[in-house]
From Swiss-Prot:
PANTHER family associated with the record: OS01G0212500 PROTEIN (PTHR33388), PROTEIN SPEAR2 (PTHR33388:SF1)
GO MF term set: DNA-binding transcription factor activity
More info: Knock down expression of SPEAR2/TIE4 and SPEAR4/TIE3 by RNAi in a SPEAR3/TIE1 null mutant produces lines displaying epinastic leaves.
Protein name: Protein SPEAR2
Primary role: Adapter-like transcriptional repressor recruiting TPL/TPR corepressors to inhibit TCP transcription factors. May be involved in leaf development.
Taxonomic source organism: Arabidopsis thaliana (Mouse-ear cress)
Length: 300
């Protein structure tokens, strides 16, 4: 520091020296006021320049190889996904890259492996051996606790049972009978379908025929060689409708029988001897042709 000591008994030369010394102190103070950047800013700028001019990650020197067969080394999930999500032009600083654990990344390791249950099921279905630990892959069977059973055994048993069912189903004969089957001798238990034309067939003396081509009175079921296919109604009638149809058919049969007994030309005498006892009508008094049996006085 400069000290300004003013003395009253000083000469002119002393005052001049005092002015020079005070001027030199002022120059030194100006030099001390020069500001400098701290060391942190320079280092950050240097790192930024290195990142800009550094080649991408793909052309960087190969990473150190690690034994792939060692099952205890697993890359943390966060570091793997960080490496995948970063852009190819991005590169880690030298200080950060030295602290992070580095593992070789392959295409197969980026895809998450399937669960143990699913992998074993696919391998059993396709008859493929279990995948062996190869280069770039980690395969380790997770053994269940002692108080639990492994799910692989149950899956294999289930698949064996399914294969047995499929094999027996192939050997089983066709369950349905076709039209070209051999005749079977013995009482049949086929259900007959009652149709509206059944009563009409009975009145005409025709026995109803079942679907298999056999009559209901014959206990031996023999397929008829000339079976005519019938057109069945589209809708099966209900109980009340069926009774009404039966009643209509019955009335129709009665009317047909009554008409068959009555002569068509009622005005022609039938020639029965019972008609001789009847009284003579007034129209017969004027004359009639008894020889031919036709009434000539008939007025239409």
């Amino acid at each position: 520091m400069c000290s300004n000591n003013n003395t009253s008994s000083g000469s002119y030369g002393e005052l001049q020296l005092h002015d020079e010394s005070s001027g030199s102190c002022r120059k030194k103070q100006k030099k001390d006021k020069v500001r400098r950047r701290g060391p942190g800013v320079a280092e950050l700028e240097k790192i930024r320049l290195q990142e800009e001019y550094k080649p991408p990650l793909s052309s960087s020197p190969s990473l150190p190889n690690i034994d792939h067969h060692h099952h205890t080394l697993f890359a943390p999930a966060s570091s793997v996904y960080d490496l995948v999500m970063t852009s190819p032009n991005f590169s880690f600083p030298e200080k950060l890259a030295s602290t992070l654990p580095v593992f070789p990344i392959s295409y197969g390791s980026l895809i998450p492996p399937a669960p143990i249950f699913q992998r074993s099921q696919h391998s059993l279905m396709m008859n493929l051996p279990n995948p062996s630990p190869g280069a770039g892959r980690f395969y380790q069977f997770i053994e269940p606790p002692s108080n639990q059973r492994s799910c692989v055994d149950s899956v294999s048993q289930f698949l064996e049972e399914e294969n047995k069912k499929i094999f027996t189903a192939k050997k089983r004969p066709w369950p349905f009978l076709t039209d070209t089957t051999k005749p079977s001798v013995g009482p049949t238990t086929t259900s007959t379908i009652i149709r509206p034309d059944a009563t009409q067939n009975r009145s005409m003396g025709i026995t109803p025929v079942q679907e298999t081509g056999t009559t209901t009175s014959n206990p031996i079921a023999i397929d008829s060689p000339t079976s005519i296919p019938r057109h069945y109604p589209r809708f099966i009638p209900l109980g009340l409708q069926y009774e009404q149809q039966q009643q209509k058919l019955k009335d129709l049969d009665e009317t047909m029988q009554w008409r068959s007994k009555k002569p068509f030309y009622s005005f022609i005498p039938s020639g029965d001897p019972s008609n001789d006892d009847q009284e003579q009508r007034p129209c017969d008094l004027f004359g009639s042709a008894a020889d031919h049996g036709i009434d000539l006085n008939l007025k239409l």
